[in-house]
């Protein structure tokens, strides 16, 4: 392999790739480029992507474009492949995973709902109960109690956390929040070494809008790519790639 004036033997490159733990990432890129070739964007679509890229990076001048490519050791075809890959992967994911996406969304919806909640945690059960009574009776605001007494990082935000997907929370915590109504304050409960006070501020049900659709398609694509790389690393023969071109 030669990069400008630097020449490296191919066997040395192989060793470097292994020692740098780059075998899996390189295999993943190989699979992505195989998918790109399988999808086969037409020249008009690639031209549009290239023009948009050149305008965004102020590379419409040929001299600037050539210098940009030379700096990276790329050819013009390398750039077109680089620009084609995200769109090709997007189309591949849509065709492969799109038909079952609604069912997949419904299966995961409980973890995709986002929640805004207030949390106060202490180690002393007596203090937890005393604070719960004071907050419940309006003697002290939750925010003030959390800022003063909470032993976790939520003290800096006066107890307020989120919004975040329920699936990112500790399962016990997420389960408790699922069963609260907005504004409900739970009595002190123990989770691990902590006694918690929880109040649900807002629960936002996930919707299968375009942003959610693209997120789920990307997640499924990543899972598929990683599984294919694992099979290649294990010496297995992966399934043949298929993509049906639109008429």
Regions found by a protein language model. Give the residues of each.
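Peptidyl-prolyl cis-trans isomerase
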Residues: 2-247
């Amino acid at each position: 392999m030669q990069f400008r004036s630097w020449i490296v033997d191919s066997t040395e490159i192989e060793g470097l790739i292994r020692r740098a733990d780059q075998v899996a990432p390189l295999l993943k890129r190989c699979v992505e480029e195989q998918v790109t070739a399988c999808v086969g964007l037409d020249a008009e679509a690639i031209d549009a992507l290239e023009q948009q890229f050149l305008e965004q990076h102020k590379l419409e001048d040929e001299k600037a474009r050539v210098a940009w490519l030379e700096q990276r050791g790329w050819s013009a075809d390398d750039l077109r492949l680089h620009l084609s890959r995200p769109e090709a992967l997007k189309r591949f994911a849509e065709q492969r995973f799109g038909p079952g996406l609604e069912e997949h969304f419904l299966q995961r919806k409980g973890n995709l709902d986002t929640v805004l909640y207030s949390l106060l945690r202490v180690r002393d059960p007596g203090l937890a109960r005393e604070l719960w009574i004071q907050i419940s009776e309006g003697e002290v605001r939750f925010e003030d109690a959390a800022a003063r007494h909470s032993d976790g990082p939520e003290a800096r935000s006066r107890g307020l956390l989120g919004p975040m997907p329920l699936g990112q929370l500790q399962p016990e915590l997420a389960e408790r929040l699922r069963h609260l109504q907005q504004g409900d304050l739970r009595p002190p409960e123990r989770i691990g070494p902590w006694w918690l006070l929880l109040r649900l501020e807002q629960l936002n049900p996930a919707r299968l809008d375009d942003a959610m659709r693209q997120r789920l398609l990307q997640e499924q694509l990543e899972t598929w790519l990683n599984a294919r790389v694992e099979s290649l690393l294990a010496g297995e023969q992966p399934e043949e790639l298929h993509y049906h071109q639109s008429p």
